[in-house]
């Protein structure tokens, strides 16, 4: 693996403020990469470019421990914390210690995969363009207003990751687990959503078809317009698609799950456990089974449960 290490003696920039951290700046050029893996709490800005490079600005105390490496077509951003001196470890763990600066601009023309964890902050200067793009954010990653233009997009959020997306793609597959959350605007032909844990998801857009799998105590809200939607809900999950205007809907619920649906033409339902289906408009209704569950029109004032 070709490894680039920042040396503290390079280009140290000192702020006029005595409280500011001294930083080391460096630009590194690469022949190419298609993936990015961010392993520590870097603040990363993705910048579309015809060439491949990174611009780094990092705390001089840890500059020699910062790694920017390309391995197997993947740009890896990491910090070798095990090699910190005892004095530095003590300093960084001290009360009111300021986290080290770890700012990176990544320049590349196209990406296939972005993986980030450990409280990294991700943004982009312009639209991220790709053919097939895979994204996995975990461990309190914060993604700010990522605009994606691709043929197919696959997104997975875990462990308190929080993200804001604008997506233009033919296919979108989105998975949210644990206590992750996302807000997104989507323009797509097909969207598949898998929500579990206590994840919270807000999705607005234009779709042809939407497929939803909701489990545990997840909460997913849809708005926009489309052709057809299918929902499978279990646990105490909630799917609120009341503001999503669709022609057709198929809903299967179990346990204490709740679904609000807005189907203009046709609605098919199977309700088990103590589940509840609330529907809008006046569709043709086909019931496969209802066992210890309820189905009501949204205008029914007797039902005031908000999930």
What residues fall within each predicted segment?
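Acidic (Asp/Glu) and glycine-rich low-complexity loops/linkers
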Residues: 20-39, 43-158, 162-175, 183-185, ...
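Short, surface-exposed interaction patches in beta-rich subdomains
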Residues: 165-167, 182-307
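Bacterial Sec-dependent N-terminal signal peptides
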Residues: 1-25
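Intrinsically disordered and other compositionally biased segments
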Residues: 6-7, 11, 143, 182, ...
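Residue-level detector of intrinsically disordered/flexible regions characterized by low predicted structural confidence
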Residues: 4-5, 114-115, 203, 242
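N-terminal hydrophobic or amphipathic segments with adjacent small-residue motifs
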Residues: 3-6, 14, 34, 191, ...
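Flexible, active-site-adjacent loop/turn segments at secondary-structure boundaries
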Residues: 17, 42, 244
